[in-house]
Design a protein with these regions (language model features):
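Positively charged, low-complexity intrinsically disordered leader regions
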Residues: 1-27
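Conserved phosphate-binding/catalytic region of the ribokinase-like
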Residues: 1-9, 169-171, 196-324
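Substrate-binding N-lobe of the ribokinase-like
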Residues: 6-7, 27-95, 102, 322-324
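Structural detector of well-ordered beta-strand residues that form the stable sheet scaffold
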Residues: 8, 59, 134, 159-161, ...
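Glycine/charged-rich beta-loop-alpha catalytic/anionic-binding loops adjacent to active sites
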Residues: 25-35, 73, 251-263
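Short beta-strand scaffold segments in enzyme catalytic cores
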Residues: 49, 95-99, 107-108, 243-247
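Conserved phosphate-binding/catalytic loop of the ribokinase/pfkB sugar-kinase fold
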Residues: 60, 84-88, 96-141
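Conserved beta-alpha-beta core of the PfkB/ribokinase-like small-molecule kinase fold
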Residues: 131-218, 242-243
Length: 324
């Protein structure tokens, strides 16, 4: 890891509350839960946590309420810098209230809470001390765009990584400042959303299992050539248990299979955020793209063998041990 490499994550912090139920509550019904689990979450917090677990110097820029102090402490215990994590009075930390049924079905209610705290105008302190920026789409888009633009206009520009989850609207995608982006991380469904927004009829997210890799690969190349997109952006497309596709401008689309698991899958919730965090940390270390991605895949393999979003993210030592 370069001693001068530092990542800023601008993103969300949530408290995820899981109500364990015999079935999803029907309209007008009142039932008792069989258990309540409370976990730290939010894509910004999860990804910052993963960068730190992967050995990267990282700071989280976001907001919580007084009820989220324990999440702040959890992030700090992993090595995440929290000087830019604002505590908003008279506001709750972002919430995900999840009904988790015995048959595996779930129902989710989201409340943005402090994540949508946005001073006017958005204050962006100098990004000169950072080399990398990681953003998602769980805070106001205007803030995300401001940070990306500032990163792109810095001298030298920051390496910026965008994981558009939840997905932007078609109009927002067409107006997005792609020229300020270095890397885009999407899954096959999100890749299809982008192509449709840009006027293509291709949709890799609807491909049959045996056609997924070929159609997603073709979709990546089509996206790269689209006039709405920037030809300088690298693309990573995750395919779940099938592995990943990756594209560096000027090169061919590459493929890597998912890592072999040593234990049964317990929870895939945190896999995407684990991947994003480990990917940025790999870039910060100056590793080759293939080596960085192989490390990401092993980290995700360990992640899905455990429960929770943050709790399941492995340390770099654990990943190295499995790679050995």
């Amino acid at each position: 890891m370069s001693t001068s490499s530092r990542c800023l994550v601008r993103g969300s912090v949530n408290i995820d509350e899981f109500f364990h139920l015999p079935h999803i509550v029907r309209p007008g019904e009142t039932i008792s839960s069989t258990g309540l689990t409370k976990r730290a979450g939010g894509k910004g917090a999860n990804q910052a946590f993963a960068v730190a677990r992967a050995g990267g110097q990282v700071e989280l820029d976001g907001a919580i309420g007084d009820d989220g102090i324990w999440v702040k402490e959890m992030l700090e215990s992993a090595g995440v810098g929290t000087d830019k994590l604002k505590i908003v009075k008279d506001e709750v930390t972002g919430r995900a209230v999840i009904q988790s049924a015995a048959d595996g079905e779930n129902s989710i209610v989201l409340h943005a809470g402090a994540n949508y705290y946005l001073p006017s105008p958005t204050p962006i302190t100098s990004l000169a001390t950072y080399t990398h920026l990681l953003v998602q789409n769980e805070v106001p888009l205007s803030s995300t765009l401001a940070y990306l633009t500032a990163a792109g206009q810095s001298s030298p520009p920051l390496t910026s990584v965008f994981n558009p989850s939840p997905m932007l609207t078609p109009a927002q995608l067409r107006e997005f400042p792609w020229k300020h982006l270095s890397w885009l991380i999407v899954n096959e469904g999100e890749l299809g959303d982008l192509l449709l927004a840009f006027g293509s009829s291709a949709n890799p997210g609807e491909a049959k299992e045996d056609e997924l890799q070929a159609k997603a690969s073709a979709g990546i190349l089509e996206l790269h050539e689209n006039d709405y997109f920037s030809k300088n952006v690298g693309i990573i497309c995750t395919l779940g248990a099938k592995g990943i596709l990756y594209y560096e401008p000027g090169k061919e689309v590459g493929y890597l299979p998912a890592a072999k698991l040593q234990n049964p899958v317990k929870d895939t919730t945190g896999a995407g955020d684990c991947f994003a965090g480990y990917f940025v940390a790999g870039l910060m270390r100056g590793k080759s793209l293939q080596d960085a991605l192989k490390t990401c895949l092993v980290a995700c393999g360990i992640c899905v063998e455990n429960e929770g979003a943050m709790e399941s993210v492995p340390t770099l030592d654990a990943v190295k041990e499995r790679l050995a």
